[in-house]
């Protein structure tokens, strides 16, 4: 039979089937029926069942017919990571690798048992957790953990409280997954002053790059702070910063921490200038209202 035209989502379904479910549609369908934590929101159960029917009519594996060599390489990499994670359970005394494997392979929505076990081990877990944050593999839902592992690692790191994790959490910012972004920022906030000091250096760093923006975004979630506010206000006096549509709104937000009447009056004068961007007027007025 001719293979019906398949779209990109169909090919992704095949890749996920092969990576996570041993190439078995039946196992994948059961997993989706039970709403497993790794179920992809873009994959409809009806479509998975349709692909199973197409394969049965064809009498050949759809992946073999349709997937590219790079796709097979990605699947093979995912399977290899699964094998490595499962291998550690053969070594009963390998406490740290076992705890990390438990965290990655968990099927719990909120794996509090696994997280608690890691936190109890303390600082010896910091480096393995940082590796999870730094590895691009574990952000990929095709790989073990379904892309959830960095979030769990961040929670563990802020509970353990070793500040060496701060630069790694910061470097993880700026991704497309907004849920992950929120968790990373929450972890940075949990570190308190050490994280704030680190972020301030990135906020004022030169030349201007994505680090400045990511620092501003993260600092907006901290309690208002006069030192941060003064730094942000100073940055707003640079025309390039003021006209940066991504950066400037966060700088204005941070200015809420200006506490002296003198600084607040200078801020008021800034937003009244004819050269002040119109698109930022409302943001500026919001800060003024917050001081009333």
Sequence positions of predicted segments:
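Amphipathic alpha-helical scaffolding segments comprising HEAT/armadillo-like alpha-solenoid repeats
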Residues: 89-102, 121-139, 162-172, 193-206, ...
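Extended alpha-helical scaffolding segments
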Residues: 12-50, 216-292
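Contiguous N-terminal and early-domain "leader" segments and peripheral loops that mark the onset or edge
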Residues: 1-7, 188-189, 250, 260, ...
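Aromatic-residue detector
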Residues: 30-45, 98-99, 103, 145-146, ...
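Structural detector for internal amphipathic alpha-helices that build alpha-solenoid repeat scaffolds
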Residues: 49, 80-89, 109-123, 142-160, ...
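Short inter-helical turns and helix N-cap capping residues of alpha-solenoid HEAT/ARM repeat scaffolds
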Residues: 107, 136-138, 146, 176-180, ...
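Generic detector of bulky aromatic hydrophobic side chains
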Residues: 3-11, 178, 182-183, 203
């Amino acid at each position: 039979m001719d293979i019906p035209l398949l779209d990109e989502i169909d090919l992704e379904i095949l890749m996920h089937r092969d990576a996570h479910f041993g190439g078995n549609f039946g196992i994948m369908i059961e997993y989706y029926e039970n709403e497993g934590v790794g179920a992809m929101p873009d994959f409809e159960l009806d479509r998975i069942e349709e692909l199973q029917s197409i394969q049965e009519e064809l009498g050949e594996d759809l992946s073999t017919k349709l997937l590219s060599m790079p796709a097979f390489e990605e699947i093979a990499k995912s399977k290899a990571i699964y094998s490595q994670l499962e291998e550690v359970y053969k070594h009963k005394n390998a406490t740290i690798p076992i705890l990390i494997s438990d965290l990655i392979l968990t099927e719990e929505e909120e794996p509090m048992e696994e997280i608690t076990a890691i936190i109890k081990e303390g600082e010896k877990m910091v480096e393995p957790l940082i590796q999870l944050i730094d590895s691009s593999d574990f952000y990929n839902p095709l790989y073990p953990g379904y892309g959830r592992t960095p979030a769990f690692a961040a929670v563990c790191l802020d509970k353990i409280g070793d500040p060496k994790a701060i630069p790694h959490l910061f470097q993880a910012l700026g991704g497309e997954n907004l849920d992950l972004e929120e968790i990373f920022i929450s972890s940075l906030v949990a570190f308190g002053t050490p994280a704030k000091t680190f972020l301030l250096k990135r906020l004022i760093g030169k030349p201007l790059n994505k680090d400045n923006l990511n620092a501003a975004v993260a600092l907006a979630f901290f309690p208002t702070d006069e030192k941060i506010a003064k730094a942000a206000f100073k940055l707003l006096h640079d025309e390039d910063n003021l006209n940066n549509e991504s950066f400037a709104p966060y700088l204005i937000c941070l200015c809420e921490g200006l506490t002296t009447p003198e600084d607040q009056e200078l801020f008021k004068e800034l937003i009244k200038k004819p050269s002040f961007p119109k698109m930022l007027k409302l943001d500026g007025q919001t800060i003024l209202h917050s001081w009333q």
